[in-house]
Each structure stands twice: as structure tokens, then as C-alpha cells.
Amino acid sequence: MNLFNRNFQIMDISVVIPLYNEDESLPELTAWIERVMAANHFTYEIIMVDDGSSDNSWALIETLSTQNKHIRAIKFRRNYGKSAALHCGFQNAQGDVVITMDADMQDSPDEIPALYQMIMSEDYDMISGWKKKRFDPKSKTIPTKLFNATARKFSGIHL
């Protein structure tokens, strides 16, 4: 595992982005997150966890992290899966609030201020958001529905 930009400091938000072969979306996603953070005066970091990508993702992340001091980069030698990437991101997060986002831009960075406000003002330990309308292929929506059904069964929380 490689780790770039590891300077410890407390900040408002850590955005953890697990990714696998997402080189096309990363520049736009990071620019979008930066705009939202600047507009809301948040102190933040973006932790990108490359889960063994075989495309140009890692080279692009290295470039982005040298251009932006808020980006921290972690690289797995092989694909361990999204759960492992999230876990690694959580372990390295320094923000008071940790927000996860998928690299495919299905999650909107514009929601970050509302999520942060909800956590801070309502004194919640955790919140979860979901899309009302998805534009994903069935190969993504079916596993999500199975996960949510399992989570409902074991937690009693309707997802």
C-alpha cells in the first residue's frame, strides 16, 4: 500500500473515495468537491483509495495529489474490493466527519453541506443517503437491492 500526503491535522471533513478503474471521472469529481468545500469554507481532505486499478487511475491520482494539497492517495497492489478500500480510507481519515463517495459521480458533492450539517446539528453518529432515482445498469442496482434487503433484515432499519 502506498500513501501520499500524510500530514496529520484535524479538519471538518474527510471525503473517502474508493475507486477501481475510474480515471475518466476523477478530474471532474475532485474539481466538483473542491468547489463545494471552498463555497462552504470547510477544512477537508479527499482520500482516494485505488483498489488495484488496471487503467490510468493511479497515475492520474498521483498528478492530482501533487496539484492539490487536500488530496491524499492510497494504492492497493491488487483489487481487494470496495469494503477493504473504505476500511483503509476510514483508518486514515482525519476529519471530524467522514463522507464516502463513489468515484463514478453517481453521488453528488453538492449534498456534502447538508450531510455535514445534519451530523453536526442533530448529534448523529452516522447518517446514510440514497438516490431517489438511479441511472445505474442492472448489474449495479440488483446487488444494491440485495444489500439493502439484508441490511433491513438484520438492522431493522428500512434502507
Predicted feature locations:
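Cell-envelope/extracellular polymer assembly enzymes that use nucleotide-activated donors
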Residues: 12-14, 45
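Short, well-formed alpha-helical segments that are part of the catalytic scaffolds
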Residues: 22-37
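Donor nucleotide-sugar binding loop of glycosyltransferases
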Residues: 22-25, 53, 82, 108
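Acidic helix N-cap motif at the loop->helix transition within catalytic regions
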Residues: 24-28, 55-64
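Short beta-strand/loop segment that forms part of the nucleotide-sugar
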Residues: 30, 34, 42-53, 74-75
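A conserved acidic beta->alpha catalytic loop
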Residues: 50-59, 105-106
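Acceptor/aglycone-binding surface of glycosyltransferases and processive sugar-polymer synthases
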Residues: 72-78, 82-92, 97, 109-159
